[in-house]
Design a protein with these regions (language model features):
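Extreme N-terminal, non-catalytic leader segments
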Residues: 1-10
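NTP-dependent small-molecule kinase module
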Residues: 4, 132-138, 155-204
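ATP-binding Walker
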Residues: 19
Length: 204
C-alpha cells in the first residue's frame, strides 16, 4: 500500500479485443485489496455480466461528449462507429495503486502525465483463438474492423514494459501479480533510499 509520500503506480493494461484484460484485472482486484480500478467511460452497451460503475461507466454518446466538454474525460478514442472509450481525469484513491485498461494511444498520454506508469500488454494465445473470442462477443460484420484494431494494438506491443501471453488465465494472473510485486518493490526501495540520503544530508 502507498502512503501520502510515496507516489502511487498506475498499471496500464492493453491488448486486442478478446485478450482477457477484464478477466485478469478482476482477478487482481479480487486478490489484492490495495489495488483500485480506474473505471473508464464507454458508449457501447454492457456485455453479459458487466456491471456499471465497475467494469465501465456506461453512458450515451451525448453524455460522453458532454463529459469531454466539461474536462472530466482526460483522453478518449472512437474505436468502432459510435463506440467511444474515455478515461477520467481523476485517477487515484489515496493510498492505493491503480489499474486501468487503455489502448496504446491512451497509454502514451498517461505516460506523459504520470511518472509512475507501468504498461502491460496482454497477448491472446493464438490468432485463431483471438478470432473465436471476437466472434463470441460481436457480430460477424464487425470481425474485420476488430481484427484490424487488434493488428494495430499488436504492432505497438514491443514498446510496453511487459508482454504477457494469456494462454491460461490462472497462470497469466500469477505472472501479472508478480509484475505488480516487483514494481512495488522497485518503487518502495527507491523511496527508502531517497529517505536515507535526505536523513544523511540533514545530519551533516
Amino acid at each position: 500500500m502507498t502512503t501520502d509520500k510515496v507516489e502511487p503506480i498506475l498499471f496500464i493494461f492493453t491488448g486486442p479485443s478478446g485478450a482477457g484484460k477484464g478477466s485478469v484485472m478482476r482477478a487482481l482486484l479480487r486478490d489484492d485489496p490495495t489495488l483500485r480500478k480506474v473505471v473508464t467511460y464507454t458508449t457501447r452497451s454492457p456485455r453479459e455480466g458487466e456491471v456499471d460503475g465497475f467494469d465501465y461507466r456506461f453512458v450515451s454518446v451525448q453524455q460522453f461528449l458532454q463529459l469531454v466538454e466539461q474536462g472530466k474525460i482526460f483522453e478518449y478514442e472512437n474505436v468502432y462507429r459510435d463506440h467511444y472509450y474515455g478515461s477520467p481525469r481523476e485517477l487515484f484513491v489515496p493510498g492505493n495503486d491503480g489499474i486501468i485498461e487503455l489502448d496504446y494511444k491512451g497509454r502514451i498520454k498517461y505516460q506523459e502525465r504520470w511518472r509512475q506508469v507501468i504498461s502491460i500488454f496482454l497477448m491472446p494465445p493464438s490468432l485463431d483463438e483471438l478470432k473465436k473470442r471476437i466472434l463470441s462477443r460481436s457480430h460477424v460484420a464487425n470481425l474485420s474492423a476488430r481484427l484490424d484494431n487488434a493488428v494495430e494494438q499488436l504492432r505497438h506491443a514491443k514498446s510496453y514494459d511487459y508482454v504477457v501471453k494469456n494462454d491460461d488465465l490462472d497462470q497469466c494472473v500469477a505472472r501479472v501479480a508478480d509484475i505488480v510485486r516487483v514494481e512495488r518493490l522497485r518503487r518502495d526501495g527507491r523511496y527508502q533510499l531517497d529517505e536515507m540520503i535526505h536523513e544523511l544530508q540533514d545530519e551533516r
